[in-house]
């Protein structure tokens, strides 16, 4: 078994938020929570929505936070229009007619009938709105729940960050589940059964955390049918320039992985690397330094070892421009407003890696996203070119 991680316990607030974010996590429960929440929002019982959401969540085992958020889609900005529609719908259902919009009509209005119309129309609109919202949620969430084994695995890997900050935990949950590269690494047979894995520019260590969690899950007998055999005894190394991100990786992995805070161009590399992952890193360094970095890593790899390089394809039109915009915004938020990026086309990346003694294939890696990402799967030749 892998060594146990040395982590501090999450705070009470973190545990409460964790419960609210993760309870009722199946596809059907998600749909019921959104549908019932919107039904509560449309209901005429104004002032009781919070209590109704808590009670429904407890009664049916649904996510109370999502119930309440869905209820608040019917907010004060649109509530007057909703109430008007409910009264008119109720009047039409009760009497076959609607209220005339005149002062005389309202002056002779029967309060009892008005209240009955509001209740009747509100309940009908509540049921219809809830059904539509629930069905749409169920359909739209289909892709997310298409692979429940991987969803469960990513959730467990993200939980390693729970005691750091809620932001780091939420980022890990979203990134591991939404970025197709992580599932590809586990399901495509690229992981060696043993040996050395190096993640260059590992950030908070998401890939390493996922591999470590996969190893633990496999030891416990939880491994998806049809997937390649999981790693066993794989030594994990991460290299990260940013101290804060490196600290998060150390927290999540403990003594399961060695995390080095260093510039990848100067870092100490382990010997006989079996798999090197370089995700979204090379474009961050100047072009003259890209080749030497690849050569330096290649020199530390075994013959036949694998290098996985994920980059954006600069020839991909608007999808590449979207990547470029996202990177620019991220750099601004990190205070790196003068950052420069050295992008290349997928063909140019392939040529660069081939020049360092790799047999390279290109796999699209933007499924489910609007981004022009590709994964270069580079196998080091047994006899490298001089």
Spans of model-derived segments:
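A short glycine-rich, Lys/Arg-flanked "PGG" loop and its adjoining helix->strand segment in the class I
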Residues: 291-303
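Transmembrane helix boundary and interhelical junction motifs in multipass membrane proteins
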Residues: 42-55, 60-70, 75-85
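Class I SAM-dependent methyltransferase Rossmann-like catalytic core
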Residues: 153-185
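Conserved glycine-rich SAM-binding loop
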Residues: 203
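C-terminal alpha-helical "lid/dimerization" subdomain adjacent to the S-adenosyl-L-methionine
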Residues: 310-355, 363-365
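A conserved beta-strand element that flanks and buttresses the S-adenosyl-L-methionine
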Residues: 277
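Class I SAM-dependent methyltransferase SAM/SAH-binding core
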Residues: 198, 206, 210-258, 263-265
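Conserved alpha-helix/loop element of class I SAM-dependent methyltransferases that forms part
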Residues: 176-193, 214, 218
